[in-house]
Amino acid sequence: MDSTSSLHGSSLHRPSTEQTRTDFSWDGINLSMEDTTSILPKLKRNSNAYGIGALAKSSFSGISRSMKDHVTKPTAMGQGRVAHMIEWQGWGKTPAIQPQHSHEAVRRDTDAYSDLSDGEKEARFLAGVMEQFAISEATLMAWSSMDGEDMSVNSTQETLGCNYSDNYQELMESQDALAQAPMDGWPHSYVSQGMYCLGSSDAWEASDQSLIASPATGSYLGPAFGDSQPSLHEMGPSQPASGYSAQEPSSLLGGDTDWAPGVGGVDLAGGPAEEEKRKKMRGAGTWSPSPHARTPRCPPLSAGRCLTSHPQACSPLMRRKARPTTSFLPLLTQPSTPA
């Protein structure tokens, strides 16, 4: 009786257990909850590590089964989804068959994949993932090598730039040392550098405009200035230098003629002969009343006259700054002290 009652109870218990076993459907994914539902009552009675492990295992099994059914499904591969791109080994190769047979080839491949077992599908899936990781690693290594080459090229360019800057600094220091040299040896060194004209045939034209300075104060005076005219310290403040007319400083001083006596247009020192010479030189383009006009020109004087007429206004530092080292007006208005 007890055995029959126990059997009857068991028979009554089985349908109730089967009724509690349901299938959960969510967005087309059939997740079987049989194992989880059967384990839950046991966990309530005996909550131990074994029961928790069994629940975790059953949950993982359900998730993996859903992934196999819906992610690695052959229909998804046939439709060209991401799973097909990961799993299929020959996705990047160009097909050797004709285009009209491509659909048949895809169908055969799909059938062949469907015939594989679960272990073979998992192995194929892992092989595809490892291949993708290998491709990514190789790409990263190639990028890192290219970055290393770029860094080496940049370092080489920086080294060349440093060498250029050092050479430029040495050049500037040598020019400054030359500018600070005594005036005794200036003609030979400057003539050797090609900064002065040595002939009297034609006017000298400089190719580099950065080395051109304003003409010196005595460069456009008459050729007989050193022979026939008195020195600057013997002239008074009101006596102008030889070779100037009363109206010529007006262009330099902005039209102010109160500084020099005399009538405009009359040469006070040279006379008509000197005025005629200056007109000829002005027509030839080698003379200007202003020291800042026609800077590339040098008067066609002899070598000695050209080298000794303006030594104080032709230092390398002055040529670099393009301005004379001595002022023009003090030489005319103030007597210089004898050495």
Swiss-Prot record:
<feature type="compositionally biased region" description="Polar residues">
    <location>
        <begin position="324"/>
        <end position="339"/>
    </location>
</feature>
<comment type="similarity">
    <text>Belongs to the FAM131 family.</text>
</comment>
<feature type="modified residue" description="Phosphothreonine">
    <location>
        <position position="325"/>
    </location>
</feature>
<feature type="compositionally biased region" description="Polar residues">
    <location>
        <begin position="239"/>
        <end position="250"/>
    </location>
</feature>
<feature type="region of interest" description="Disordered">
    <location>
        <begin position="222"/>
        <end position="339"/>
    </location>
</feature>
<protein>
    <recommendedName>
        <fullName>Protein FAM131B</fullName>
    </recommendedName>
</protein>
<feature type="modified residue" description="Phosphoserine">
    <location>
        <position position="47"/>
    </location>
</feature>
<keyword id="KW-0597">Phosphoprotein</keyword>
<feature type="modified residue" description="Phosphoserine">
    <location>
        <position position="327"/>
    </location>
</feature>
<feature type="region of interest" description="Disordered">
    <location>
        <begin position="1"/>
        <end position="22"/>
    </location>
</feature>
<dbReference type="InterPro" id="IPR026782">
    <property type="entry name" value="FAM131"/>
</dbReference>
<feature type="modified residue" description="Phosphoserine">
    <location>
        <position position="114"/>
    </location>
</feature>
<feature type="modified residue" description="Phosphoserine">
    <location>
        <position position="117"/>
    </location>
</feature>
<dbReference type="Pfam" id="PF15010">
    <property type="entry name" value="FAM131"/>
</dbReference>
